[in-house]
């Protein structure tokens, strides 16, 4: 199996798990705040089958991976019934925040485990350096690095969850950032915002990758440097 295929498998595994946690966080938060809609549909679960969208969760990320583009996508939106919330505005706001917050929390947990691997486990530091080099498409002989799979999963666990955290906070429908922003807009402005927001998202999706790609490599280099020096 080629190194590129191995990288893709690692990324897909992390992405699918991140999607599942993200959407189940929405569903669980909505349930706790009074709306059982997602719970009744079986969405308070880490089972990826309940959350994955064929195009957004599988085909689009694979297209991005095989074409050297962005590893990005979406899961099936978490269904909510706002009138069920004990406080509609608070319920919508906290439910929207729960998804990105779960990605940030997962990135934090992965970082903590990576630091444990680096400082407390023999061979951990070398495996982390190998994971970062492999992610940068440097060909290595990984046969002797028993901890490499763990280091690779944790590395992508940080990187992919941070990307999803930032991506989902973009204030364009249907992303979580739009639901958060809409809670602070007057009703008339909010209605207009929701109508034009989807077109804005499509434009962002088409052009945003090219624009953000300018910053991605320098930011990734800074990210890898920070991991190596922590």
For each predicted feature, which ranges?
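Hydrophobic transmembrane alpha-helices and their immediate loop junctions
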Residues: 1-230
């Amino acid at each position: 199996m080629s190194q590129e295929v191995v990288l893709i498998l690692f990324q897909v595994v992390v992405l699918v798990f991140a999607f599942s946690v993200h959407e189940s966080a929405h569903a669980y938060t909505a349930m706790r705040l009074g709306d059982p809609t997602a719970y009744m549909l079986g969405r308070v679960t880490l089972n990826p089958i309940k959350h994955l969208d064929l195009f957004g969760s599988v085909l689009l990320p694979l297209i991005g991976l095989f074409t050297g583009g962005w590893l990005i996508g979406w899961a099936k939106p978490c269904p909510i019934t706002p009138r069920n919330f004990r406080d509609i505005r608070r319920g919508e706001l906290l439910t929207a925040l729960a998804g990105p917050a779960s990605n940030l929390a997962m990135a934090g947990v992965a970082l903590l485990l990576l630091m444990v691997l680096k400082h407390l486990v023999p061979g951990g530091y070398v495996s982390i350096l190998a994971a970062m080099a492999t992610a940068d498409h440097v060909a290595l002989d990984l046969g002797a690095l028993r901890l490499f799979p763990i280091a690779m999963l944790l590395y992508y666990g940080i990187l992919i969850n941070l990307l999803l955290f930032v991506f989902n906070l973009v204030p364009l429908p249907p992303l979580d950032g739009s639901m958060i922003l809409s809670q602070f807009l007057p009703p008339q402005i909010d209605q207009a915002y929701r109508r034009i927001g989807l077109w804005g998202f499509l434009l962002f999706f088409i052009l945003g990758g090219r624009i953000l790609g300018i910053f991605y490599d320098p930011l990734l280099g800074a990210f890898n440097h920070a991991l190596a020096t922590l």
